[in-house]
Amino acid sequence: MWGPAGLTDTLVELGILTPELAPRMAKGGTIHPIGPDIAITQVHAEHSSEFIYVNPETTKREVHVGGEPVGFIIKLENGFTIYHMGDIGLFGDLTLIGPRYRPDLLLIPIGGHFVMNPSEAAYATKELIKPKMAWPMHYASNPLLKGTPAEYKAALGQSSTQVIDAKPGDKKTF
């Protein structure tokens, strides 16, 4: 499992993964896990990052280090680029990530409370990242995540970004 070093270290320490299955990765690092033409780059993000584990011996929940928060830029062999933002809040590095990686598809949280709300997500989409397409995520999975795709679209207003309408379990081809 490629992920932030702190998270992979925690998973190894708890015995969930073996060291061979948990290679370390750091922000700014790029890997080519399935060949030279597909690249995954770990980028900075802003959100909490902990790993909740139910100890099988005590049956109690434990909070462990989850590693630094990150997002992922995935560049496919045809050049199509995806930016998975994760549980992100609006932050300044988005002004660098958008122009540097120029994602075709943005997977963007819109639910609010733990992540950006629809208005903040629309600002990040339209003013900072400027993707061709955006796929709203991290909404309606928790009562506190009240933002909706309709609110995101309304906040986005006139934009060249196409918003992907999808429900959990939907599949899309690009």
Label for each model-derived stretch:
Residues 4-10, 26-29:
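Short, polar loop motifs at secondary-structure junctions
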Residues 11, 50, 116, 144:
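Glycine/Thr-rich phosphate-binding loops of Rossmann-like dinucleotide-binding domains
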Residues 64-122, 127-129, 137, 141-143:
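Metallo-beta-lactamase
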Residues 15-19, 23-34, 120-174:
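Binuclear metal-ion centers of metallo-dependent hydrolases, dominated by the metallo-beta-lactamase
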Residues 24-99, 168-174:
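Core dinuclear metal-dependent hydrolase active-site scaffold
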Residues 9-13, 93:
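Phosphate- and divalent-cation-binding pockets in alpha/beta enzyme and binding domains
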Residues 1-7, 133-138:
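Short internal beta-strands
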Residues 1, 40, 87, 106, ...:
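Divalent metal-coordination and catalytic microenvironments
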